[in-house]
Each structure stands twice: as C-alpha cells, then as structure tokens.
Amino acid sequence: MRVAVYYAPPPADPLWVAACAWLGWDAERGAAVPQPLPGLAEITAAPRLYGFHATLKPPMRLATDYGSFMDDVARLAATMPAFMLPPLAVMDLSGFLAVRETAPCAPLQALADRCVTTLDPHRAPPDAAELARRRGGGLSAAQDSHLLQWGYPHVLDTWRFHMTLTRRLSAAEQAWVRPAAAGHLASALARRQACTALSVFTQPGPGAPFRVAERVALTG
C-alpha cells in the first residue's frame, strides 16, 4: 500500500465534481464517472490513477504503520490554519494541462513544506529501481538532492502547486484539449477555493487507483 497527503476540494464542491468527471474517476466514492467528451479516456489515464488532487506529501510506502502515520497527520493539521487559495485556472505545465494558482500563496507553500518534512519519518526509502525511474527524465542538482533526502524530486523549493488534468500533450492536442478543459471547469473555477483539510489518499497495490481514505480538518 502507498499513502499520500493531498489537497483536494470537498466531495460536494463543484470543482471536485467537474474535475472527477473530466478524469473519469471519483476518488471519494471509488467509482468511475462518465467523461464529458469523447477522446478523453486515453489522455487522462495517468492522472485518473491518482484522482483529482494537488500533491502535498507525495505517494510513499510506509516505514511505520498507518495508525501512527495518521496520528501525525492529525497533529500536523491541528497546527495549520485553513486559508483561501488564489484564483485557479487551467494552465500548461511542461506540456501537461493542470489547474494551477494564478498568484503565489505563502500559506499553501508552508503547508506543503510542513507535510514533506513532518511526515517524512513515516516514509520507506525508494529502492534502486524507483531512484532510476525518477532520474530517467533528468533532474537538476536540487531535485536530485530532494530525491535522496525526501524520496521525491519536486518538493520544497522545487514544488509547484498543480492539479493534473492530462498526460503530456502534443501541440495539436493542446489546441483542442485546453479550451475544452477550461470550458468544462469554468463555472467551478469561478468560485474561490479554500484549503480546509489534509486529504489522505491510499493506493492498495501497484496499478490500483488511489482513493480518499480520510480528510483531516486544518484547525490551527
């Protein structure tokens, strides 16, 4: 099993509902969802596996037990306040489409940093195969250092908030997929989002889709 700590909109929020339909998977219900357009199944296959989310603590195998991990998640959530996110929009991110913030958000960065560092004692180290896979795409010196120390290259100063909507797209695919995604999510993205909880997702085994296991309110 792998666990991850994510930001995810509440299950009744229009953004969650619309994005789950876009991906074809509702990680809260653990159920497939009809997609709004033909041709989406293949280009959303990779993000569908993880569910709609923004990563705070990347997926990891536990070196401890789930109960002690959740105890520390609860303790962390009790020290961090809820906050409003900046307006969000569909953007290109290195060829992928993702929902991203339109302005920097210091509380969001602080929350992600705390999740990475505070929960790291529960992380089992990556094996040689995982290290090789992560390095296969080419990493900067900072990213490689993070990979060795934190098990993932895109954390702390190299972290970027993003809620992935597609695989990497060609220019021709971008030409129709980006406006389709923006249109599908437009009314939901017009509403300001709040970060009010840490969402713990779990993956029971390799290749299985992630599901929401628990949502822990931020009460600091």
Listing of model-derived features with the role each one plays in the protein:
Residues 1-92, 106, 110-192, 205-220:
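Basic, often amphipathic N-terminal segments
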